[in-house]
Every structure is written in C-alpha cells, then in structure tokens.
C-alpha cells in the first residue's frame, strides 16, 4: 500500500482448488486465474459510481476500471484432485469459486498494511487514503 497515494499492489497470489478429477488441467488453471483476476478487480477497483441524480457515471469500458495485466501479479495455481463421488467423471466445478477469496484476502491484507479494519470494498486509492488519514 502506497501511504501517499493509497494505491494497492497485489504482489503475489496463489489459487488452490479441489477440482475433483481435473480432466483438462490447463483449463482448470485458466479458470482459477480468471476468477482470481476478477476477484482482485472487485477488491481493488470495480464499482458503479452514481451521481446525485442517480445517473451512472462510469457506464462503459473507458470509465469502469477493470484490472489490466500490468496491475496483476503472476497467479500461481495449485490443483488438488479429490474425485467427486457424486459425479460420473469425478469432476467438480471450478469456474466460479476463484472469484470470492480475493475480496477477503485483499481487504485483510490492506487492513493489515495500514493498521485499520477495511469494512467496505473496493480498496480504491481514495478509499484507502481516507482510511489512512482517519486512523
């Protein structure tokens, strides 16, 4: 966390998932990485901004901030394979699960770095600066 700007950099991220039987491990890895990227985006930048009249101020890709490759660390993946006894091929869903953990992980890491409890996401620079200044 940059104490002067409030910018947060995620320097390392590891996604671990029980995929049941990973029929296509490369695809599983891609799903875990994609979910982590989306979760990191939600944790750091992504939010709808409305003006006082209720009009969205960031309705498009030019205004709605999603993470770029340069914003992200290399995302390590670890695939655990415990076959699912309730599926004929032993597989488990992995497409959605990677999205949620970054929200808690990033929020907790930011709170640790600035010695404040983070109670609202995203941890955008203005929000982080506000937490730092109000400590």
Predicted regions and their residues:
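C-terminal catalytic domains of large/alpha subunits in multi-subunit enzymes
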Residues: 1-135
């Amino acid at each position: 966390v940059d104490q002067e700007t409030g910018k947060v950099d995620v320097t390392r991220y590891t996604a671990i998932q029980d995929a049941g039987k990973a029929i296509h491990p490369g695809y599983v890895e891609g799903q875990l990485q994609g979910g982590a990227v989306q979760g990191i985006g939600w944790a750091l930048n992504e939010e709808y901004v409305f003006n006082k009249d209720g009009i969205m101020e960031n309705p498009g890709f030019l205004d709605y901030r999603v993470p770029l490759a340069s914003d992200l660390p290399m995302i390590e993946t670890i695939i655990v394979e415990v076959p699912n006894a309730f599926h004929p091929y032993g597989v488990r869903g992995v497409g959605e699960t990677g999205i949620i953990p970054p929200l808690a992980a990033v929020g907790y890491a930011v709170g640790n770095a600035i010695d404040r409890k983070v109670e609202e996401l995203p941890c955008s620079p203005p929000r982080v600066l506000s937490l730092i200044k109000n400590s």
